[in-house]
Design a protein with these regions (language model features):
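Conserved C-terminal structural/oligomerization subdomain of aldehyde/semialdehyde dehydrogenase
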Residues: 15, 20, 32-299
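Local beta-strand/beta-hairpin segments that build beta-sheet-rich folds
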Residues: 24-29
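Short beta-strand to alpha-helix junction loop
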Residues: 2-11
């Protein structure tokens, strides 16, 4: 059974389309009684053979497995094709070859990657669950950031390290952040900067789990974050927050702060800032907004 009639219809429509395109569709179920099947929203377990990934245009949430075979040595290219689709909820890998593991770990853009284990039934606190890209992003259900996100309306809270870090090496401050802060203090000597909550990106953290199982948790920055503010202080604070997590700041071309100060910033900071023409035709993954409620509604 799937969640509702609409989901059933959408999944069945996809299966019918794949069959009409000439792809091999395999279905098997124990009970084929039409009357009993009509009493619920059932989809039989379905296997669809595809010649390549281009024939799959979207995620299909249901008991449908698409099978694509590839030749040895083509795995990196296949992973690139998967990443290009933009969806990245869960990926599973079964292999004894360490090189294959490292290839998938380094190239896969997914929220959860399971190696030599079950890919469903994520355990709270052990396997935080959440996707990447078009499959959704966020604090991950059951993860160490989840309760912090649920407490976003609490005025006094602090994000401490809720897990043990693999490496004992201290995390150095982003060089771009250092240069930007030095420029701010020189250009705006009276400004008081608020240090953003410390969120370490790009490092693996160990989570608890049963003996013989290893669970690694990594926080990755959004690639590009649009900064929208109505005054210099807020604009500076936003750029500080974006750079502090390793993201690339994006600003609108008519931004008064950027028009006035961009050329005086350090060259590396200028290179890191992405100036975009408009929001409708430009790429960015998140927005930081300082302004009143009406401006936010318009946005």
């Amino acid at each position: 059974p799937v969640i509702d009639a609409e989901a059933q219809q959408n999944i069945q429509k996809h299966i019918d389309q794949m069959r009409s395109k000439g792809h091999k569709v395999h279905q098997l179920m124990f009970n084929q009684d039409a009357y009993e099947l009509a009493q619920g929203t059932f989809i039989p377990p379905t296997l669809i053979e595809l010649p390549n990934l281009n024939d799959l245009e979207r995620e299909v949430f249901g008991p449908v497995l698409h099978l694509i075979s590839y030749k040895a040595g083509q795995l990196p290219q296949l992973l690139d094709q998967i990443n290009t689709k933009g969806y990245g909820l869960t990926m599973g890998l079964h292999t004894r070859i360490d090189e294959t593991m490292q290839t998938v770990i380094s190239k896969a853009h997914v929220g959860n990657l399971y190696i030599n284990r079950n890919i469903v039934g994520a355990v709270v606190g052990v396997q935080p669950f959440g996707g990447e890209g078009l499959s959704g992003t966020g604090p991950k259900a059951g993860g160490p950031l989840y309760i912090y996100r649920l407490m976003h309306q609490v005025s006094e809270k602090k994000l401490a390290q809720p897990y043990a870090m693999n490496s004992a090496q201290a995390t150095l401050e982003n060089p771009l952040l250092q240069e930007f802060k030095a420029w701010v203090y020189k250009t705006f000597p009276t400004i008081s900067l608020t240090t953003p909550a410390k969120i370490t990106t790009g490092h693996s953290f160990s989570l608890q789990g049963p003996t013989g199982e290893e669970n690694q948790y990594m926080i990755l920055p959004r690639e590009s974050v649009l900064s929208l503010a109505t005054n210099d202080a807020d604009q500076i604070q936003q750029l500080l927050a974006i750079l502090s997590v390793g993201s690339r700041p994006a600003v609108l071309a008519d931004n008064t702060f950027i028009l006035k100060h961009l050329q005086s910033m350090p060259a590396k900071v200028v290179k890191a800032i992405k100036v975009i023409k408009d929001m409708e035709s430009s790429d960015f993954e998140a927005v930081l907004h300082h302004g009143d409620a009406s401006a936010l509604i318009d946005l």
